[in-house]
């Protein structure tokens, strides 16, 4: 009689050593340049390091990113969008396409963050043409900030809705239809308060919390999938149905293609949070490598785990007619109860999903508060000194005022739900619009420079893939923005209309007005460590190593010049344009006199002496 084994011997021996991060790193070797490439150079900026540089590791960035892009929480709370606009095909294929395209977007954004390891408005400032630096940086920063605030609100509010659904599972009459939104907002306020207090009082545990997040999501997926398959009472759907069935009758759209495009909203709400991670650059030891790799690994892990999570749900999916009978609870709750015919088991499954809420909520407040801090350092926000304040004797080095501001914004947006659910949903849709457009600006600027500006980035896409991945990313961002603006069902009423575009336009107008009222006179461009003249595309940098503060440089003309330079660079290098190397660098001319700050003129030697006190238009 043959001997049967559950797993092949080689799999059993090696499965305990399986590391998903290692698998994703191997995948990155296909699209990324070799890490050992020469001439790696990340831009460093002359800001005082106030936050804890060792607070987060690359693994913690992956965990925080997975929390922001949790397929368990995100796909479950927005399941109605996919079910109405096509069902399994829209959900599964839409998530796969979104996962690949958003991974491309994370790779493209990772190049910029690797070269300019700060929040995205910094990268836009460094990439933009001279006359547009201030404007590009301003719009990128504000769109990213608004996107952070609204995405944080959408995550916590979705969790509050799921909590109410959990309460109503046993008795749907506990809360009346008239008071449903009121109690949802109360739960929302509680969630925001809890995750905010964790950021204020227990920030030193965020590293551990982010790592636990990965394990929670993975085990939640395993438990939910297995329990659904084991305790399913009806007939299983075929694999063909689970992957390719399409029915958009509930949407009212005659066009199947349009319904499919609208279905991307579900995946975009889930996966767009990757662009919030660069705000954490001040709290990572090696941000030029850890942020890009952590960001793309988080997208891959979220997409991969999301597919595994969704397939069993599609296999036990009840008919749509049974899923929208009770509008007080989310469709995912009806899926569990109709499939298992057990309130107790369904209650446990929803609890596993709600566990993600804690990690996602904490991470969203963390990133939004750091976006406030980073943008305020350049005086972009009124009362910027308050938002950048960090208690010098605090153990965790957290910008507490920025955390409180992010909580207040969430509280305010939550009030909109009491006034109008359509208005609140519009702000949630605007979250994706703002994040997409804030990512769009620096990506377009990279193509505008023909990718020369990121040539020496420590993490860089291989040349043969770079243009393709950048262009696909830009097209995807535009498609995502169009998708989010469309109503999920037609015909529309005043209550069901999608007002996301109107809110987005309103945000643009406010940002523009604030620019002319405040930004034009107070906002300052990011301050780099050293002064660099513009480098033409056909020129290469000449790099001189400074052994100490007094060095003799022999110029091309044979002239020896002694320079006394205060070296602020960590690497100890100063870059000199080869075209200018034959000239006396301390002689005033059109190239070395900075005239952007009034009528006062300084030579290059004086500018080095003032490097710690002034900001430069890079």
UniProtKB/Swiss-Prot annotation:
InterPro entries: AA-permease/SLC12A_dom, Amino_acid_permease_CS. It is found in: Golgi apparatus membrane. Residues 1-60, 111-131, 172-179, 232-297, 368-402, 450-464, 517-618 are cytoplasmic. Keywords: Golgi apparatus, Membrane, Phosphoprotein, Transmembrane, Transmembrane helix, Transport. The modification Phosphoserine is found at residue 569. Residues 598-618 have a biased composition (Basic and acidic residues). GO terms for biological process: gamma-aminobutyric acid transport; polyamine transport. It is a multi-pass membrane protein. The chain crosses the membrane at residues 61-84, 91-110, 132-148, 155-171, 180-200, 212-231, 298-317, 343-367, 403-419, 426-449, 465-486, 499-516. Pfam families: AA_permease (PF00324). Required for polyamine transport. Transports putrescine effectively and spermidine less effectively. This is Polyamine transporter TPO5. It comes from Saccharomyces cerevisiae (strain ATCC 204508 / S288c) (Baker's yeast).
